[in-house]
Amino acid sequence: ITTTTMQFNPSGLELERPQQLFPQWQPLPQQPPFLQQEPEQPYPQQQPLPQQQPFPQQPQLPHQHQFPQQLPQQQFPQQMPLQPQQQFPQQMPLQPQQQPQFPQQKPFGQYQQPLTQQPYPQQQPLAQQQPSIEEQHQLNLCKEFLLQQCTLDEKVPLLQSVISFLRPHISQQNSCQLKRQQCCQQLANINEQSRCPAIQTIVHAIVMQQQVQQQVGHGFVQSQLQQLGQGMPIQLQQQPGQAFVLPQQQAQFKVVGSLVIQTLPMLCNVHVPPYCSPFGSMATGSGGQ
């Protein structure tokens, strides 16, 4: 609705002025679309801004915060306390513990030395106890028992007769059994410490008797005697408690002595010291000593 104001003017041109004003007012409402466009431009610019909010999507960062949680869970700080608990300081005390064991082994070697030296001083005083008449008589019985023939007809050499003692069917004669009992009884009456030198004197007496006798059967002893003395008796000067033996006779003493030492304790059930040897106090020398 348009209102017109009428003024009293003589000319009617004034009526046209309001008509000019209306078209001037008409473009004015056309300007507001610019105003509408102006706000529309910033608003769509501001709208993508909230659309660009991937930043709330960054709450994944707390998921990434689990990595620092894994850092304390890492075993590396656990290994760090393990390193101060290294076994190297534990091995260091083990080494000083092993070192006292070496001085412990040294006294063992020191104890073993007197043990090996003990039988030698024991044999020397025991060899001095041999000259008693009763012991010589007892040893002569054992010597006769070892040299006696234990078969019916044939006379067995020394080595064969000693080995035959292990065979029960060979010893059949009563005389052999009687002398065996006498020898075992008399050997049991001797002190245990003096049994070893007693057996040594038996061995020496047997070997010396084989050297003197010429009516010995064929065997190892007779062949050795023929090579040494050509069938002639060998006389050696003998001191009380000590007998001189030729170097060539050591093999003979070793064979006879080992057999006697093995057979007599088994036959008589008598204990003999383990350090007993067939040589004992017998010294090596030449025929003129």
Swiss-Prot record:
<protein>
    <recommendedName>
        <fullName>Gamma-hordein-3</fullName>
    </recommendedName>
</protein>
<keyword id="KW-0926">Vacuole</keyword>
<keyword id="KW-0963">Cytoplasm</keyword>
<dbReference type="InterPro" id="IPR001954">
    <property type="entry name" value="Glia_glutenin"/>
</dbReference>
<dbReference type="GO" id="GO:0005773">
    <property type="term" value="C:vacuole"/>
</dbReference>
<feature type="compositionally biased region" description="Low complexity">
    <location>
        <begin position="60"/>
        <end position="131"/>
    </location>
</feature>
<comment type="similarity">
    <text>Belongs to the gliadin/glutenin family.</text>
</comment>
<dbReference type="InterPro" id="IPR036312">
    <property type="entry name" value="Bifun_inhib/LTP/seed_sf"/>
</dbReference>
<dbReference type="Pfam" id="PF13016">
    <property type="entry name" value="Gliadin"/>
</dbReference>
<dbReference type="InterPro" id="IPR016140">
    <property type="entry name" value="Bifunc_inhib/LTP/seed_store"/>
</dbReference>
<feature type="compositionally biased region" description="Pro residues">
    <location>
        <begin position="41"/>
        <end position="59"/>
    </location>
</feature>
<dbReference type="GO" id="GO:0045735">
    <property type="term" value="F:nutrient reservoir activity"/>
</dbReference>
<feature type="compositionally biased region" description="Polar residues">
    <location>
        <begin position="1"/>
        <end position="10"/>
    </location>
</feature>
<comment type="function">
    <text>Has a role in the transport and targeting of prolamins to the vacuole of developing barley endosperm.</text>
</comment>
<keyword id="KW-0758">Storage protein</keyword>
<feature type="compositionally biased region" description="Low complexity">
    <location>
        <begin position="18"/>
        <end position="40"/>
    </location>
</feature>
<keyword id="KW-0708">Seed storage protein</keyword>
<feature type="region of interest" description="Disordered">
    <location>
        <begin position="1"/>
        <end position="132"/>
    </location>
</feature>
